[in-house]
């Protein structure tokens, strides 16, 4: 299953034509194995420019498999991921990326992202990346 992170949904929503946008569009069109998690839903909905757009985005996201964020397991997992990344010389800019990574790791999901920071985190902790992009991940 491919866990699409916030940056992938933003690419899709803006129809950027990037490789990540095209990959997520393909997965959606073919009923591919796409999942979301609450931290991603939170970030995507927070970026909505209106209540109507928020409702549209919520309907879209909730069509896909939900990897529930487990507060007991995933908060601790995110803290361990953050610490491990720092020890490897990669300091994540935000804990939400570590929360998303913790969920992906627990479910053994592949991440689809255009976020350079989350890409580095995934590489440090050994999460598989769905890498359709020809362009480099965008800095956060």
Task: Give short role names for the model-derived ranges.
Residues 1, 101, 105-140:
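Acidic, PIN/NYN-like endoribonuclease modules and their adjacent C-terminal/linker elements
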Residues 1-36, 46-59, 130, 138-139:
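Short, well-structured N-terminal submotif of metal-dependent ribonuclease cores
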Residues 5-6, 44, 78, 104:
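Generic structural signal for small/hydrophobic residues in well-ordered secondary structure
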Residues 6, 38, 94-98:
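Conserved glycosyltransferase catalytic-site signature
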Residues 9-10, 41-44, 118-119:
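A generic structural signal for short hydrophobic patches within well-formed alpha-helices
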Residues 27-28, 85, 104, 122:
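A generic structural signal for well-ordered alpha-helical segments
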Residues 31-32, 65, 108, 126:
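Residue-level detector of structured alpha->beta connecting loops
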Residues 66-114:
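Active-site neighborhoods of divalent-metal-dependent phosphate/nucleic-acid chemistry enzymes
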